A protein has these predicted regions:
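Conserved catalytic-core segment of NTP-binding enzymes
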Residues: 1-61
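C-terminal boundary of histidine-terminating zinc-finger modules
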Residues: 66-88
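Repeat-unit-sized solenoid/scaffold elements
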Residues: 53, 58-71, 96
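C-terminal alpha-helix
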Residues: 88-97
């Protein structure tokens, strides 16, 4: 799936927007207790090393609940693991682009 997405992006770059660029790959719905989650992280990092954000968004019930209440995770529960993960991602992106 990820390979197809990258091919689609290359096609869009070629035909419509040569300046289109990928900021990075974000791993989401991660659960460290699941072998599959760990295998996916390893495979993605192995194939797309420098493109993968260090921050991983962990599976979290608060992340699932927030959209049901029409709120961002920060507004819904800023102390949740999901909110912390997204704040860490924001910091990582800012540092990367300075």
């Amino acid at each position: 799936g990820l390979g197809k997405l990258l091919n689609t992006i290359k096609s869009v770059q070629k035909i419509h927007n040569p300046n289109l660029d990928i900021e990075g790959l974000l791993l989401t719905m991660y659960d460290s207790r699941l072998r599959l989650s760990n295998q996916v992280v390893e495979e993605v990092q192995k194939h797309f090393n420098d493109m993968v954000f260090e921050t991983v968004i962990q599976r979290n019930i608060k992340l699932s609940e927030a959209p049901s209440f029409g709120e961002s995770i920060i507004n819904y529960d800023a102390t949740s693991k999901g909110a912390t993960n997204y704040l860490n991602l924001a910091e990582e992106i800012i540092k990367k682009n300075q």
